[in-house]
């Protein structure tokens, strides 16, 4: 899939040092543009910059201080301190799970992972994202997490706090591929935007869409809630590119790409 640069007005793309075999650096959760060939069009999300074709490569959080290789390019992912988040959940059964709940979460993780592994080419993605909800950012991407002082997996999403019932919209056009009520995520939606770009929405109080439904940019898909394992009403928003969780905040920063060119 190829799209013009203008479709990426709000997406962070690192455009530095495209020389062959040069080592490049980026932060975890970012996207880097790598020179592409016509053979890459059906395999990657690509963008045309100054009449040259580039494929968009996500930088995994888990590979900090490591290098990945894309064709002839070496990309080293920086070590970055995103800070930490400590929360207390009064309901201990949501932290130290019973066997029944543990079995449930295991089954649910398989369902969710199957959806997130989806790769389709039905739609040309538009990375000119809009903010899915009006609220206050309560926890940013990359934070170390502690729940009741127990270390947990890092927070690779964006939490936006808002009043119960606040409208949530699709940040760009896509197809709903999963709707469900899950132990951790509560009422949950996954949207496929095409070519490995997916978004998910957790802890909703209401869901206004169905599986296989096409949603357009700005269309209402749900409402903020506190279902699942939470401490209060908020949207837990995750963005995936090629199965890598990238920083959602980069996609909604107005004029971010233009500032790099």
Q: What are these language model-derived features?
A:
Residues 2-9:
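Bacterial N-terminal signal peptides that target proteins for export
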Residues 12-21:
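Hydrophobic h-region of N-terminal signal peptides that target proteins for export
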Residues 20-91:
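Cationic-aromatic interfacial patches
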Residues 70, 167-176, 206-224:
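Short, well-structured beta-strand-loop connectors
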Residues 76-185:
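Surface-exposed, glycine-biased beta-strand/turn segments
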Residues 84-94, 98-102, 125, 210-217, ...:
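Acidic, glycine-rich catalytic/binding loops that coordinate metals and/or anionic ligands
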Residues 161, 167-171, 201, 212-215, ...:
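Small beta-strand-rich domains/subdomains or short beta-sheet motifs embedded
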Residues 171-205, 233, 238:
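Zn2+-dependent peptidoglycan hydrolase active-site motif and core
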């Amino acid at each position: 899939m190829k799209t013009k640069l203008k479709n990426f007005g709000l997406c962070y793309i690192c455009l530095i040092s495209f020389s062959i075999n040069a080592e490049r650096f980026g932060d975890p959760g970012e996207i880097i543009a790598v020179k592409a060939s016509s053979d890459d069009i059906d395999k990657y999300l690509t963008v045309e910059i100054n009449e040259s074709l580039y494929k968009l490569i996500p930088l995994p959080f888990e590979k900090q201080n490591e290098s990945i290789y894309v064709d002839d390019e070496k990309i080293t992912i920086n070590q970055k301190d995103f800070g930490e988040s400590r929360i207390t959940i009064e309901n201990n059964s949501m932290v130290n799970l019973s066997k029944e709940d543990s079995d449930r979460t295991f089954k649910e993780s398989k369902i969710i992972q199957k959806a997130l592994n989806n790769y389709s080419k039905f739609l040309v993605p538009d990375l000119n994202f809009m903010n899915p909800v009006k609220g206050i950012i309560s926890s940013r991407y990359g934070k170390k997490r502690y729940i009741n002082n127990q270390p947990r997996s890092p927070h690779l999403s964006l939490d936006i706090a808002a009043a119960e019932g606040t409208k949530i919209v699709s940040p760009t056009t896509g197809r709903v591929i999963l709707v469900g009520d899950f132990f951790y995520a509560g009422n949950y939606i996954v949207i496929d935007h095409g070519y490995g770009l997916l978004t998910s929405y957790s802890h909703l109080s209401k869901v206004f869409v169905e599986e296989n439904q096409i949603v357009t940019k700005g269309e209402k898909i749900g409402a903020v809630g506190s279902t699942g394992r939470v401490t209060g009403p908020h949207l837990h928003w995750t963005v995936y590119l090629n199965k890598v969780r990238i920083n959602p905040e980069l996609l909604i920063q107005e004029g971010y790409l233009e500032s790099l060119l």
